[in-house]
Swiss-Prot record:
Name used for this protein in its record: SPbeta prophage-derived uncharacterized protein YoqE
Gene field: yoqE
Organism, scientific name: Bacillus subtilis (strain 168)
Length: 54
């Protein structure tokens, strides 16, 4: 299993990760998103996804 999995905020509109958020869990990533942009985080275009490392 991967111990160093990071989650980030992905915008389905721009098709890339945004806000530079890298957290160890989905919950922490979502909390950081709300801390940064407030209630706009409820918009459908933001998803919490695993960040793939090469």
């Amino acid at each position: 299993m991967e111990n160093n999995v990071l989650y980030g905020v992905y915008s389905t509109r721009s098709r890339k990760f945004c806000f530079g958020i890298e957290e160890p869990s989905k919950t922490k990533a979502r909390k950081e998103l709300f801390n940064r942009i407030g209630t706009d985080a409820y918009k459908w275009r933001f998803e919490i996804r695993k960040i793939k490392r090469k």
